[in-house]
Curated annotation (Swiss-Prot):
Entry cofactors: NADP(+)
Species this protein is from: Aggregatibacter actinomycetemcomitans (Actinobacillus actinomycetemcomitans)
Active site: T127, E129 (nucleophile), Y151 (nucleophile)
Residues given in the record as NADP(+) binding sites: 8-13, 60-61, 82-86, 155, 181, 186
GO-annotated biological processes: 'de novo' GDP-L-fucose biosynthetic process; O antigen biosynthetic process
Pathway: Bacterial outer membrane biogenesis; LPS O-antigen biosynthesis; Nucleotide-sugar biosynthesis; GDP-L-fucose biosynthesis via de novo pathway; GDP-L-fucose from GDP-alpha-D-mannose: step 1/2
Superkingdom of the organism of origin: Bacteria
Keywords: Lipopolysaccharide biosynthesis, Lyase, NADP
CDD domains in the cross-refs: GDP_MD_SDR_e (cd05260)
Gene Ontology molecular functions: GDP-mannose 4,6-dehydratase activity; NADP+ binding
Function: Catalyzes the conversion of GDP-D-mannose to GDP-4-dehydro-6-deoxy-D-mannose.
Protein name: GDP-mannose 4,6-dehydratase
């Protein structure tokens, strides 16, 4: 039986990847961060918590001895590092914590692999936020990086140290530069899920208005469940490499808001510009969307769009779910949750 470690298993990607690996017959050592309020709702929603081959562990990625202990205990063939302080906005208020987890944590895991068994295959979750102030459109594996947040900078360290260990110690280290990928399991601190959850509440008359920051920000959004398949495929190749996973389509936050309201049959029209822009229900005249400057970031990333042609050519991977389908899927899940009186 193949064995894998998945760090960050309580998150969106970690939960989907754990499910995928279990379905493929793996024994999975799934880790989550020590905290006062551990929440494994995603694991529960996918109905895998009691799977006989899933082993859940509290784990501190910032502690080197914990990394060595985990790798020694699990003796994995594959390690997927998805653990991170992964919210861009929080990284501005918690830059040191972000660096410790998202940057140095990668080094700790790679060192543990180098010491215990350099033949272990390693996947590092890199991000399109490393491109930041984009130098090329669309972005590929060869596009220069220009991160615009402490999160992007920390992820760039994790990316480069993975490549460094690949070249220095012959470790099978793959880096997946994943563009934004969403799902019903996305956290509400991320803009797409904030939108779908709030629009669901508006549709159910539980909330009156959605407040957002930069409506002009453009992102390449895909379906997270498809992206974890790409992660797995990277580690099945004969040679380690770096791959972009994306949809090669970009839409504004405003576009996603419009899709969300369309999914619940509420007619919406935007008026005004900048901080004065509003979204109005054309049937009732109610203001349903407002811009709040508090949600603007100190340094914005304006445009991300990825070219996944290398992943398609080598891995046979490509996105299948359209953004409209994804938005509808998320809205429907949030409506059901809010009808039941809860929303994670």
């Amino acid at each position: 039986m193949k064995t894998a470690i998945v760090t960050g298993a309580s998150g969106q990607d970690g939960a989907y990847l754990s499910q995928l690996l279990l379905d493929k017959g793996y024994k999975v050592y799934a880790t989550y961060r020590r905290s006062s309020s551990v929440n494994l709702w995603r694991i529960d929603e996918l109905n895998i918590r009691n799977h006989p081959n899933l082993h859940l562990f509290e784990f501190d990625l910032t502690d080197m001895s914990s990394c060595i202990s985990l790798v020694t205990k699990a003796q994995p063939g594959e390690v997927y590092n998805l653990a991170a302080q992964s919210f861009v906005g929080v990284s501005f208020s918690q830059p040191v914590t972000t660096a410790e987890i998202t940057a140095i944590g990668v080094l700790n895991l790679l060192e543990a692999i180098r010491i215990i068994n350099p033949k272990i295959k390693f996947y590092q979750a890199s991000t399109s936020e490393m491109f930041g102030k984009v130098q090329q459109i669309p972005q590929t594996e060869k596009t220069p990086f220009y991160p615009r947040s402490p999160y992007g900078v920390a992820k760039l360290y994790g990316h480069w140290i993975t490549l460094n260990y690949r070249e220095s110690y012959d470790i099978f280290g793959c880096s997946g530069i994943l563009f934004n990928h969403e799902s019903p399991l996305r956290g509400r601190e991320f803009v797409t899920r904030k939108i779908t959850d709030t629009v669901a509440k508006i549709a159910l008359n539980k909330q009156s208005c959605l407040e957002l920051g930069n409506l002009d920000a453009k992102r390449d959004w895909g379906f997270a469940k498809e992206y974890v398949e790409g992660m797995w495929r990277m580690l099945q190749e004969d040679q380690p490499d770096t791959y972009v996973l994306a949809t090669n389509r970009t839409e504004t936050v405003r576009d996603f808001v419009a899709m969300a309201f369309q999914a619940v049959n509420i007619p919406l029209e935007f008026n005004g510009k900048g901080e004065n822009e509003i979204g109005v229900n054309t049937d009732t005249g109610d203001v349903l969307v407002r811009v709040n400057k508090e949600y603007y970031r100190p340094a914005e990333v304006d445009l991300l769009i990825g070219d996944y042609s290398k992943a398609k050519r080598i891995l046979g991977w490509e996105p299948k779910t359209s953004l409209e389908e994804l938005c509808k899927m998320m809205i429907e899940a949030d409506i059901e949750r809010n009808k039941l009186g809860f929303s994670f």
